[in-house]
Amino acid sequence: MSIGSMIRWLLAWAAALVVVWSFFEVGMRLWREHDPSDHRTRLVIMQWGDASEEQIVEGLKNQYEKEHPDIKIERIHANDFDPKLKTMMAAGTPPDLFYLNSDDLADFATEHLITNLDPLIADMPDGQKWLDGYYPVLLNAFRFDGHAAGSGHLYGIPKDFTTMLMYVNCDLFKQAGIAIPYGGWTWDEFFDDCKKISKLPADAAGRDYGAVFNAWPGMIQCLMRCYGGDLFNGSDFTHITIDTPAGIKALSVIQQARFVDESIYHSTGPQSGSYGEQLFYTGKVAILGPVGRWQTPHFRGVGQNDEGITSFHWDVVPLPHEQKAAVNIATVAWTMSADTKHPKEAMQLLRFLAGARGQEVVARGGMAIPSLRAVAESPAFLSGKPAHSQIFLDEVKDSYNPVFPSDPEFSQYMTDDISECLDLNQESPKQVAQDLSTDWAHEMASPLKTKQYPPMRWMPIVAATGLMIAVAVASVWLVSRRQKLGALDKKMERVGWLFVSPWVIGFIGLTLGPMVLSLLLSMTRWTAMTPMTTAQFVGADNYKEMATYDFQEHIKPALLVTGYYAALSVPLGQLAALAVAMLMNSRARGITMFRTIYYIPTLVGGVTMAAIWLWLLNPTYGLINHILGPIASKMGTAPPDWIGSDADRWAVPAMVMMSMWTVGGGMLTYLAALKNVPFSLYEAARIDGASATRQFFTVTIPMISPLIFFNLIMAIIGSFQVFAQVFVMTGGGPKNATLFYVIYLYRQAFQFHNMGYASALAWVLFLLVLALTGIVIRGSKSWVYYEGLKA
């Protein structure tokens, strides 16, 4: 046996052993988790958080196992917490206990995914006394009455929280001659102070800003409450009341400060918040807020690579008020799955995890406020910077938990609509308020929200599928029996089926099966947070919804954005790849190194590439605008804010520009095709007097036209499936400037939990791409030349 053959055999055996070991390891893992000799009660807990929070929960877990030898705890930490949790729930294997944000309570409680803790607490001898140790507003944040949070049954025990307030640069306040408002201030005073500070003389590092103001939906609601209004009239969330004097006032004062006074730092796009925080960190912003306690460790310098703020004196002040004080809070609780098999044991563990031990550690770290009064009011929380930490606790008396509809679509609607006013400055507050009211009214009137549907009948479908598979297998067996084959032919046929079986099984199980299932799901209403047995049959209503209001509001804009991107990226990408391949096809010295350099970017993952381009496209310190700045200034203009305030014009071209970074993949295939063009054809063309340009169009293009055709189809398909970069960089915003079709599909499936509607969107995308591919294939007959099919 030759060395080459030996290496191939070794690689084949190694691959086979890896596959076998993988299955064995998974099986052993399941066996270890369910070891029949281990009679301890097994509880699974799930959390998010940084390394310090992981360490806290791991320490609590070990301590509890030590004190309760009959309990075995498995801790799961997930950065992609929501997708993993919802996948586990849909699979019917949720963790017993897990973190739950107060914003998600209504969503989980409506779907009956979490346990009502009231009966379990009632069984405790000191249950009510234990609850009395927590701030009531926090407990109310995890009560749900079937319609809204704030009252009703208790579904979670808060582990920590934060009130929203303002971090201030005391030195800038002193320079502007403004007293630091420790005792409280109004919103009018806040905006006046911002104007005064923004007029301070600029230094070498640039001008100073009055504030970085976080105008998320919860903050708009808080501002409306201060002005005597609220987002909704009543707790049924059917009638939004932003189109009122309080709502218009809340939007107007922010728009005025950002775009007229320019006293508040404003930058749209995904890095606007982090860059604003960095400006505060470096002393160029006087007020950062409204934010919570989570900024404290960073400003203290607690992190491994954090130096903390040492160049100026910083502190915290209360949130401004107006007609009345209103302070929103953010809180997270330990909650119990509705499917836990050990509710009593899980409840005892929940009480321990939400107890004083862990909260004292969190308090000393400064990340959050303990939810237990005794710990929050102790030196563990109040000592250290900021000097006025007591303000966090004083704000509790005026605090409330932001209550939004259980439909996650509302937050997206509100974010998109107010973005046109507060981020893009394209619409007036009055118009934005009317748009949001109209959008929400249509959402509430949708048959998919109001109509009652029957359950999806899965058993007949499963039975029919099983019958079809049985008929197919029986047909193949009967045909093979009727064929009069010799022993050798039968053996060859069996070997053939053996070799093709991995593909057949994979195609049926991983491609055809999911396609059929998604087609069935497109006729259902299903959240994907519960087993598929809970799906409801809606018939063609998903498709009707797509063809009516949703088409104008979301689908049409998404198709226009995607089509615009495809129209630019497909031809430019193919031309760039072919041009680079022509250059790399030369015999110049060192050309191999250049081929490698051009190809390497294609190996970079989509998320990493998006992170790189976020920095490149940053309007303030990005490399691209740094290069374009001098050129633009000579033309009397400025470089665009690519994915920020100028996103409606420049976001898609920016995405196309980013796609050019990966032309190395196409270059490689074109280079291989160019190497296969017979040199004799070029010699014959030169003898006939053809110029280099004529040789390119009459020899090169026809000979590589099959590959051009293939790459064209793949590029069209790829351009309609752009996701990772856009999701990381913009999430589809601002407004709908980067709302690619697949981004909208993702929103429906995993943010709004409308998996049935998302499946319908996926089938429309499939048919659209299929139609475009068919058009290209039909048109290829006139320009694609196949050497093997020549006459």
Task: Enumerate the predicted regions with their spans.
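Extracytoplasmic/periplasmic substrate-recognition and gating elements
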Residues: 72, 90, 148, 176, ...
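Glycine-centered hinge/linker elements that transmit conformational signals in sensory
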Residues: 193-194, 236-269, 319
